[in-house]
């Protein structure tokens, strides 16, 4: 617990130094396992602001049907709804409907856990041509306490995700963006945890963004 408090104190002290450039994301990740089967449901909602709190940027809702092919491999077929507003006025809102397919591989190395996520997206964006996108993300979770990833355990969470566009349009570059994240997590229960972290998003020719992420991670089971 002392390690957690020290890390949270460090984040609280350093964030004001560049708070004017920070964006805020509030996220809920849920996974509902269906009885003793290999099927589960992924549910997710994200609220993204141009400021840490306030000036809405984007709302994302995602749901997916998952199937565990192997102990180390989960596949997903899902749908996402994304509502986006521009910075300032006018906010020029637009909607995106997104279908995605995903494969998630996991393995351990010592006490650390690693996940490799491959995702293919079909994007239907309002007033734009259809385009696809490929994403690869490497996650690593490293325990900080003897409890590991169980109740009252704390851990470091890092990931890096690359986005590549798939489009028949010379004006759309192949590189879309890259996200690098580092944070600290804590498990309130075996099936409920929270993470607080920082993410830098490189969006190519546009100015990169600094983001503070507060995320809740919840596993449920239908008996």
Predicted segments — roles?
Residues 32-34, 67, 105-107, 142-144, ...:
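Residue-level signature of outer-membrane beta-barrel architecture
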Residues 20-78, 85:
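Start-of-domain marker
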Residues 39-43, 75-77, 114-118, 136, ...:
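Transmembrane beta-strands of outer-membrane beta-barrel proteins
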Residues 20-26, 57-59, 95-99, 130-134, ...:
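Residues that define the transmembrane beta-barrel architecture of outer-membrane proteins
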Residues 34, 45-51, 79-85, 107-111, ...:
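Transmembrane beta-strands of outer-membrane beta-barrel pores
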Residues 34-38, 72, 108-113, 144-154, ...:
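Short loop/turn motifs that connect adjacent beta-strands in outer-membrane beta-barrel proteins
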Residues 1-24, 220-222:
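Bacterial Sec-dependent N-terminal signal peptides
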Residues 103, 209-223:
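Outer-membrane beta-barrel "beta-signal"
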């Amino acid at each position: 617990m002392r390690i957690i408090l020290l890390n949270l104190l460090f984040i609280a002290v350093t964030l004001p130094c560049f708070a004017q450039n920070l964006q805020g994301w509030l996220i809920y990740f849920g996974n509902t396992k269906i009885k003793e089967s290999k099927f589960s449901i992924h549910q997710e909602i994200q609220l993204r602001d141009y400021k840490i709190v306030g000036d809405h940027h984007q709302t994302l809702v995602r749901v997916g049907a998952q199937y565990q092919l192997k102990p180390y491999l989960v596949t997903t077929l899902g749908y996402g709804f994304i509502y986006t507003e521009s910075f300032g006025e006018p906010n020029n809102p637009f909607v995106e409907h997104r279908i995605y397919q995903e494969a998630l591989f996991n393995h351990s190395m010592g006490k650390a856990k690693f996940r490799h996520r491959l995702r293919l997206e079909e994007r239907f964006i309002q007033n734009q041509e259809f385009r696809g996108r490929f994403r690869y993300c490497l996650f690593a979770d490293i325990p900080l306490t003897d409890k590991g990833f169980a109740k009252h355990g704390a851990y470091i969470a890092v990931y890096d995700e690359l986005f590549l566009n798939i489009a028949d349009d010379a004006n759309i570059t192949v590189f879309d963006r890259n996200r690098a994240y580092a944070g600290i997590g804590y498990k309130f229960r075996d099936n409920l945890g929270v993470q607080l972290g920082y993410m830098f998003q490189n969006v190519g020719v546009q100015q990169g963004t600094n983001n503070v992420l507060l995320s809740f991670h919840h596993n449920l089971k239908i008996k």
